[in-house]
């Protein structure tokens, strides 16, 4: 009689253990499927556009800590742009070196998350005679952000 109750008790615990393993496996499987369906955590999509509004060729070379966007030469009216997601810590920074001959040049912060995150999602910059103008979502009203260095 004692052996029979011990076998029943062992069988009972074994059944509970197997059912627990199956339930835990199903829960984990469901959680993994939900996680795979989610998109990775990223900031909002930001676009930066630089336009040459001068009569002279504009050389630009833009970089971030992780990306080198290369050197580009823009004629009057030409555009150069790129898009990116702002990082989780809001420390995204892009800077560009500009040159127009020997007289007009400079290296400027073109996108700094703690300055531009709420200012613009489509950030437009125009190189004009006196410097670099920044435009937010209003494409008509620009502000002189940077004077050309001499």
Curated annotation (Swiss-Prot):
Annotated glycan sites = 122
Where it sits in the cell: the answer is: Secreted
Q: Which domain of life is it from?
A: Eukaryota
Q: Which UniProt keywords apply?
A: Glycoprotein, Secreted, Self-incompatibility, Signal
CC terms in the record's Gene Ontology section: extracellular region
Question: Matching InterPro entries, A to Z?
Answer: Self-incomp_S1
One biological process GO term for this chain?
A: rejection of self pollen
Alphabetical list of Pfam families matching this protein: Self-incomp_S1 (PF05938)
* Predominant location category: secreted
Protein family according to the UniProt entry: Belongs to the plant self-incompatibility (S1) protein family.
PANTHER family named in the record: PTHR31232, S-PROTEIN HOMOLOG 24-RELATED
Question: Under what name is this protein listed?
Answer: S-protein homolog 24
């Amino acid at each position: 009689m004692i052996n029979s109750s011990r076998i029943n008790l062992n069988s009972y615990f074994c059944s509970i253990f197997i059912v627990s393993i199956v339930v835990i496996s199903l829960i984990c499987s469901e959680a993994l499927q939900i996680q795979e369906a989610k998109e990775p955590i990223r900031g909002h999509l930001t676009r930066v556009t630089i336009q040459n509004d001068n009569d002279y060729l504009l050389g630009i070379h833009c970089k971030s800590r992780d990306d080198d966007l290369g050197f580009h030469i823009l004629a009057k009216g030409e555009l150069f742009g790129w898009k990116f997601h702002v990082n989780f810590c809001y420390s995204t920074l892009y800077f560009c070196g500009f040159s127009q001959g020997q007289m007009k040049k400079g290296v400027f912060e073109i996108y700094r998350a703690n300055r531009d995150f709420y200012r613009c999602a489509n950030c437009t910059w125009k190189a004009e005679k006196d410097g670099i103008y920044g435009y937010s979502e209003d494409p008509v009203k620009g502000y002189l952000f940077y004077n050309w260095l001499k």
